[in-house]
Amino acid sequence: MFLPKWSLVTVAALATCMQVRAQDEAAMQESIMVMEAYSGKVLVASNAAAKRPIASLTKIASGAVAVDWATATGTDISTARISVPQTVTLVGGPNPMNLQPGDQMTVRDALYAALLASDNLAALSVADHVGRELISRRGKSGDPVGEFVGEMNRLAKSLGMTQTRFANPHGLERPGAKAFSTAADVARLSVYAMRRNAFTFIVRQKERQITVHGASGPRNYTIRNSNELAGETGILGVKTGTTSAAGPCVSVCMERDPLVRTKPDGSKGATPRRLIVVVLNNPDRFSRARSLIRQGWAVYDPWLSAGAPVKDKRREIISVPDPS
C-alpha cells in the first residue's frame, strides 16, 4: 500500500514532533550519573544522556582550563593578578563583591570566588585574563573570552564529551547562545578536573578569605562554598549550579580509603576509590547526592570484590583520557 505524498509528509512531521516532545520531557526530568573515577565503572545512571543546560557546573570547565593554563605556563595562581574587565558590566545578575572594571585580585582568589561562591563576574574575569594570555602566546587577535570558551570546548572534545557545548565561562543562559551538556559528560569533566591538585584544593574548601584590590584600597571577603556537602567526611568537591532553565544541579566527588586486598601470591595491593555523583534538575539535590553516594558504594564494592567483571565496556565503563 502506498501513501500519498502529503500523508508521508504528515507522518514525518508527526514523528519529528514526537521526537522533540520526548526530548523536552527528558529535559524536564532529573538526570543522574554515578561513577567510580579510577575504574570508570558506571554505578547508577538515569536520563544521563539527555542534553540540557547545566548552569554553573560550566565553571568546572572554566576552572580546569585556568588551572591547566597555569600549569603549562608556570604561573603561580597565588600571586599572579588579574584585572576585572569592562565586559563585566554586561553580565548582569548578583555582584556580591561589588566588582568593578579595573579591580584586581589573584587568579586563585578569583577561582575561589567562581568555584566556591559561583561568582559569575569572577569567572568572566578569569576567562578574560587567561584568554588574553592565550591570544598573546598564539600570536592571534580577537575576543579573549571567546578564545577561553574555545579552549573549554576543545577540552570537552578531548574528553569525549560529545553532547556538550559551552557558550560562556559562567553558565548563565543567554539569547542566541545555546549551551548544553549531560550528566554523563559532566561526570567525565569532573573526573578530569579532580585529577588536578590545584583545582581539588580550591573546591574542597568550606570557606576562604580573599582580597579584591580596588581604586579605594583592598577589600576583604569571606567566600563560602555553595556545596552543602563540603566538609563532610570524604567529600572533595566539586560544584553547584542553578538557573531557571537548568534547575538545581550539583556534581560531587567523594573519596574513601584505598581498599587493601591480599593477592594470591601473598602480597597486598591497594585499590583507590573515588566516586563522582552528578545530579541535574533536582530541587533536593544535596539529599539526592548523599543518597546516590550510598547507593554508588553499595554497587561498587561488591563489583570490585567480584573481580570487577565487565560484560559491555561501552555501556559499563566511562574512560576519561588526560590530554594534557
Q: How should each PLM-predicted stretch be described?
A:
Residues S7-A15:
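Bacterial N-terminal signal peptides
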Residues M1-S7:
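Bacterial N-terminal signal peptides that target proteins for export
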Residues E25-S31, S39, D128-P323:
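Penicillin-recognizing serine hydrolase domain
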Residues V20-A184, M194:
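Active-site-adjacent loops and short helices of periplasmic peptidoglycan-processing enzymes
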